[in-house]
Amino acid sequence: MADIQLSKYHVSKDIGFLLEPLQDVLPDYFEPWNRLAKSLPELVASHKFRDAVKEMPLLDQSKLAGYRQKRLAHLQLVLITSGYLWQEGEGGAVQRLPECVSKPLWNVSNDLGLKPVLTFADICLTNCKVKNGDIEVMYNLPGGAGTEWFLKVCGLVELAFGKSGQAIQNVLDGAKANDKAKMASGFTDLTAAIGNMQTALARMNENLTPEHFYNGVRPFLNGFGGPASPISGGLVYEGVSDKPVTMIGGSAAQSSTMQVLDGLLGITHSPEKQAFLDEIRNYMPPSHKQMLADLTNMPRKVPQVVAETKDANLTKAFNGCVAAFVQYRSYHIQVVTKYIVTASKSDSPKSLAYKDTGKSDLIPFLKEVRDDTEKVQQ
């Protein structure tokens, strides 16, 4: 069995895929980026953000030092991009991004292996800082406290999963060594972590209404390109290429957590669904994408080890973990229904699907993925 160590993929056993704490501003040379990213909500609200971006100097991204600075720069630049594109709402979107943003964003994206668009890795994994066991949001999108709460809850869900790092490692190490007790312990702890993820996700209801999310937050997470997109022809990155680029928008579908659990528990999907999930991986940090590939390609997968042991305690722990994951996915469907489907009264199903999953039917897709999860019970 392949030796998979979380640290190899820049995954912490304490905070998972969240980026280790870093400074929330770049060095003084990049102060124009710091200032615009921090003041985005106020400047968008006053309809002055685009003008401020146009006055921004073209800075040299090669002066960034190290991986974390580059991740922070990517966060700032995609936030600036989002504010610039969507300041006037979906009906007032522009189709060209000024060179002062597009060129450094393109180059930083190439350095990191990330897409030059707002992704979950930016708005959550980089933007949510773990502080005293809680989540602190460094940069906000327009919408005030409701928007900040949405971002914080996304971070809390990731943190709940992140605390299962040792449990996941125990399952993998136990499977490699045929250590039934270690695997069972890992599954038990992972089951608790999935329950904590659901508890964290349920907190969305405390300070975020469906109307605020759909009309206030979601537009700033939009991608571009395609018949249902407000920027149907794609976005031109000035100073990079005159050819418009198509990108999907940022969403929790780009979180690696669900696909890690799929890989660990041996959950498989139809070729069509898997093709979409594979495409989503291209919007994740490369090390996280590699971890998913390695989990998928393990020659002797975890469920096979569980089945071969014929150990009642291990099988019970495995099935309990699968059941918790099914329950989480069922609850996630309820959240999506409340905050996206029900709130999208003016959007066609096709438009809704484009904006949120790229699938032709959002809820049926999520239900099928949940049903695929249930099938791996032993």
Swiss-Prot record:
It comes from the Eukaryota. Its cofactor is heme. Pfam families: IDO. The keyword Transport applies. GO terms for cellular component: cytoplasm. Belongs to the indoleamine 2,3-dioxygenase family. Serves a reserve supply of oxygen and facilitates the movement of oxygen within muscles. This is Myoglobin.
